[in-house]
Curated annotation (Swiss-Prot):
This is FMN-dependent NADH:quinone oxidoreductase. HAMAP family: Azoreductase_type1. It is an enzyme of class 1 (oxidoreductase). Its EC number is 1.6.5.-, 1.7.1.17. Its cofactor is FMN.
Amino acid sequence: MSSILLLTSSPRAESLSTPIAVELAEKLKNQNPGSFLVRRDLAASPLPHIDDLFTGAIRKPAEARTAEEVAAVKTSDELVNELFAADTIVISTGLINFNIYSSLKTWIDNVARAGLTFKYTESGPVGLLTGKKVYVVLTSGGVYSQGPAAPLNHAVPYLKSVFGFLGITDIETIYVEGLAFGPEAAEKAIDAAKMRVQEIALAA
């Protein structure tokens, strides 16, 4: 039995990253009978941005927090629990201004918590979320996986850095790119992504 956490972040009704990520998550679930699938639509149900109350609360032991502080970290605690429970995390995002959607960044801000998902030691920080797999479905109008525009792709390096900091190093990006290069190029990119989704599901 496994648990899959699906995070979709596109605000676009005609998003291409969302259906491909959903398809991957559903196929992984179907390949493993009894698996659980938890979905967070970060665009439709935006998470609270961290604020002064939140940052003060997470620096205290849980038993020392006021009722107001407990309420301030309640959603974050739920997100952290979902992340710990997941064996596989499927993420969808478009490349917006060379990075991820802000809704996904807010999720990261809520789950990257010292003492919970990582800790500091004498030899440096240690991630506490080990043994997990992350799939990132990344859409873009241009081509950013390689070529002259690749240095502008800050999304993938950022996600690898932050998840690596939390202890997750097994990360695969499924690029759906060149979507602005005409219908034929878009269709080719989508077909390639769906083929990779099928390969991943069959190997699960």
